[in-house]
């Protein structure tokens, strides 16, 4: 709500943000894990796909402007057997349709070079360098 209000105020709109509880963020609609999604999993052509990609692209500049922690650390979707590799290929296809840049399918060995503690059972992964994290608190 506050990010939407901020953007509307920049367009000279009169805005009020109302909180349901006695303190801010007590009435969140679901949860906040601090993940900035790259947008590879959203159904192509949906508003969610558009907003995931656009929001991810905006986050670095916004974090500098508003002075909050943000790290573009990328994300991995792990594949533990060859039978599941088509699922990675489907995610890669969605990523391309959604305009997520830099996604690729990498080998299990490449995953372990990035994250040495990853299980030896991992055979491949979708790597999305646009994924990131923020501190939600």
Name every feature range the model reports, one short phrase each:
Residues 2:
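Residues forming the Rossmann-fold NAD(P)(H) cofactor-binding site
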Residues 15-16, 34, 124-125:
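Structural motif
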Residues 29, 52, 135-136:
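Short, conserved glycine- and acidic-residue-centered signature motifs
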Residues 34-114:
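Dinucleotide-binding Rossmann-like beta1-alpha1 core, especially the glycine-rich loop
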Residues 9-31:
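Glycine-rich FAD pyrophosphate-binding loop
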């Amino acid at each position: 709500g506050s990010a939407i209000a901020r953007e509307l105020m920049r367009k000279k709109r009169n805005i009020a943000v109302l909180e349901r509880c006695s303190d801010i963020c007590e009435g969140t609609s679901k949860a906040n894990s601090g993940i900035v999604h790259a947008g590879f999993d959203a159904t192509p052509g949906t508003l969610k796909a558009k907003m995931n990609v656009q929001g991810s692209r905006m986050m670095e500049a916004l974090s500098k402007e508003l002075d909050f922690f943000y790290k573009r650390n990328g994300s991995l979707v792990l594949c533990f057997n060859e039978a599941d590799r088509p699922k990675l290929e489907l995610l890669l296809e969605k990523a391309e349709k959604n305009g997520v840049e830099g996604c690729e399918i990498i080998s299990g060995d490449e995953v372990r070079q990035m994250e040495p503690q990853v299980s030896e059972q991992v055979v491949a992964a979708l790597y999305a360098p646009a994924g990131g994290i923020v501190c939600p608190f």
